[in-house]
Amino acid sequence: MNIENAYDQLNAWINTSNGSYIDIGGERYSFSRLKTITKDELSNFESDNNLKLPNDYKSFLINVGCVNIFVGEKTAGIEIIPPTDIRNFSKSVFYNFGDDLYPRLLLTTSIPKLGYFGGFWMESESKENYGIFYPDIPPELWIEECDFIKFDDWLIKLVKYKSRKI
């Protein structure tokens, strides 16, 4: 599976589900598109905020959008957050936990049932700059404890894993 296949699969699930539960790989999930994003909107956001968003995040937003995916009947799923919400989301995550790492860390993903967050470490020179951060690790240790990967690779693994038949 490549990233285009993952985008196509997610879009198919979103269009089929439209917020209702559908059977995926032996589980029932709902999928919904919260917002579509254009190249112009991303460019304007980058200009207005003097910030360069990661290319794989921009590609996801253009091809799939801001979404709530893999929402189970007992789980909250995974939300990919629009760029306009990243700053406030980051403030809420780091509230009472020390320094807000925005814009060095762009938290773009919320996995609320587990208390996980995903984001891009912007100070990395590598394309492997996306990580999932866990609540049992103090935020001040997130960067040094994280095994960073490419966002596209994370997304492909997620789609493949969730769609496998049990």
Curated annotation (Swiss-Prot):
Immunity component of a toxin-immunity protein module, which functions as a cellular contact-dependent growth inhibition (CDI) system. Specifically inhibits its cognate toxin RhsB. Cell contact is necessary for growth inhibition. Transmembrane segments: none annotated. It comes from Dickeya dadantii (strain 3937). InterPro entries: Knr4/Smi1-like_sf (IPR037883). Disruption phenotype: A double rhsB-rhsIB deletion is outcompeted by wild-type cells, restoration of rhsIB restores normal growth in competition experiments. Restoration of growth requires the RhsB-specific immunity protein, rhsIA does not restore growth. This is Immunity protein RhsIB. The gene is rhsIB.
